[in-house]
UniProtKB/Swiss-Prot annotation:
Residue numbers binding NAD(+): 62-63, 84, 133-136, 153-154, 182, 242
Cytoplasm keyword on record: no
The protein's name: Glycosyl hydrolase family 109 protein
First and last residue of the signal peptide: 1-31
GO molecular function: hydrolase activity, acting on glycosyl bonds; nucleotide binding
InterPro entries: Gfo/Idh/MocA-like_OxRdtase_N, Gfo/Idh/MocA_oxidrdct_glycsds, Glyco_hydro_109_C, NAD(P)-bd_dom_sf, TAT_signal
Length: 456
């Protein structure tokens, strides 16, 4: 979705839809709701079976266009409408659909409010939202209020108040609102989930998650693409801007919101140096990139304590020159798995082999590959999308809707994982003092069923 600097400055703190609040996060005490739930809990929500899932897309830029392509290769779906403020990317997605021999979708453009016309249609069941971050919450809320299920790119929300608005709307409308955390559908993450459920690591103690991905080059995207708006978040906040890719899988390993929940967080950031240095090196002195005050620390490290006493380290770094990593570490009383590169150490009777990493993963894949990957992995890899995880996520969403099954990720997961952005900023700004997590489940986490090892 083409949105430039002018748009960012106008909408980052206020929503054109009138429901976004200030970027400044509420304190955790203020975030506790003083009103009853808006409706029944949507944990484990099951909606009527859909023989055909009718889809609308809002935002088909770099991310959303990939979703359109994947949906063209899914059975049991119809692409009804596509919306984007950029006519060029809109036309490209429309043309891709028709070149696959599928009916031409309706198209909506012309203003930032054009998506509401798409939502007014009565022939759409779900809406895929892939827009700049500040639009995620209002569009998700508007989608559910229009009687449709919302599937939203990460992060789900940018303030505590937005998180509560989304939860309240999901409960009031009894609609799904899933933040599409694709990494949970990676082969390695699914395998580790299977290992955890089979008790390989014993009782879980600690996890480590991260989004370490050098993205300074996006600063050269001035008028369009992700860098044209994402760069400015480094001038607005100092915390973990993007926590969910690493945190989502670790949360599912630990049954967060399904028997345990995040209790409190403490966070600290390194100096913010890298983006300013990059701007000086890559742009003229009078360029707009050299007029910005980059305040987000190059590396942010947060520690989360769960109600059961377990710990999770979460890191964010999209600035320093280093290899990509999400850490993906889970430690239990009987052993540990760590990713990037994959390695494992398990205590075995009469052996101290756990003192050395086992990096030969072939035998572990053979024994613990997730049933879903065994059944769908080849098709997922063939269709692509971050090694197949994107396709598998979308396939699984459609499968659940067509078979009247609960989604693997619900609105409580999306808000709990996303709120780390806000709480980390609050902690950093308060000398790393701890900040309490809101309980978006309103106590339902105590009886939530753990995510099982599922197949097709």
């Amino acid at each position: 979705m083409k949105l430039n600097r002018r748009h960012f400055l106008k909408t980052a703190g206020l929503s054109a839809a009138g429901i976004l609040t200030s970027q400044l996060p509420l304190s955790s005490a203020e975030a506790v709701p003083k009103k009853p739930a808006a409706g029944p809990s949507v944990m484990g929500l099951v909606v009527p079976k859909m023989d055909t899932v009718r889809v609308g897309f809002i935002g088909v830029g770099q991310r959303g266009s990939g979703h359109v392509k994947h949906f063209c290769h899914l059975d049991g779906v119809e692409i009804k409408a596509i919306c984007d403020t950029d006519p060029q990317v809109l036309d490209e997605s429309i043309q891709f659909v028709t070149t696959q021999g599928l009916p031409k979708p309706a198209q909506y453009t012309g203003s930032e409010q054009a998506y509401k016309d798409l939502l007014n249609r009565d022939d759409i069941d779900i809406v895929i939202i892939s827009t700049p971050w500040e639009w995620h919450a209002p569009m998700a809320i508007n989608t559910m209020e229009s009687g449709k299920h919302a599937f939203v790119e990460v992060p789900l929300a940018l303030t505590v108040d937005e998180c509560w608005q989304i939860v309240d709307t999901a409960e009031r409308t009894q609609k799904n609102c899933m933040m599409m955390e694709n990494v949970n559908y990676g082969r390695d993450e699914l395998m580790v989930l299977n290992m955890v459920r089979q008790g390989l690591f014993g009782e879980l103690l600690h996890g480590e998650a991260a989004y370490i991905h050098e993205l300074r080059w996006q600063m050269k995207e001035i008028d369009s693409k992700t860098g044209s708006w994402r760069t400015y978040w480094h001038t607005k906040r100092n915390g973990n801007l993007y926590p969910t890719h690493g945190l989502g899988p670790v949360s599912q390993y630990m049954n967060i919101n399904r028997g345990d929940r995040f209790d409190y967080l403490t966070s600290m950031s390194s100096p913010a140096l890298g983006r300013g240095l990059y701007a000086k090196r890559e742009f003229p002195a009078d360029h707009e990139r050299n007029q910005l005050d980059y305040i987000n620390g190059d590396i942010n490290t947060s520690l989360i304590k769960t109600v059961k006493g377990r710990t999770i380290m979460v890191q964010h770094d999209t600035t320093t020159p280093r290899p990509y990593s999400r850490h993906n570490l889970i430690q239990g009383t009987n052993g540990v798995f760590a990713g990037f590169p994959n390695r494992i150490a398990i205590e075995q009777a009469g052996s101290d082999s756990y003192h050395k990493w086992d990096m030969d993963m072939a035998k572990w894949y053979a024994k613990y590959d997730h049933p879903l990957w065994l059944q769908m992995g080849q098709e997922a890899e063939r269709n692509g999308g971050h090694g197949g995880m994107d396709f598998l996520m979308l396939w699984r969403m459609v499968y659940c809707l067509r078979n009247s099954e609960p989604l693997d990720q619900d609105v409580y997961d999306g808000t709990a994982w996303s709120v780390v952005n806000i709480l980390s900023q609050e902690s950093v700004n308060n000398r790393s003092n701890s900040v309490n997590f809101p309980d978006f489940t309103r106590g339902a986490w105590k009886t939530g069923k753990p995510l099982g090892i599922i197949g097709t």
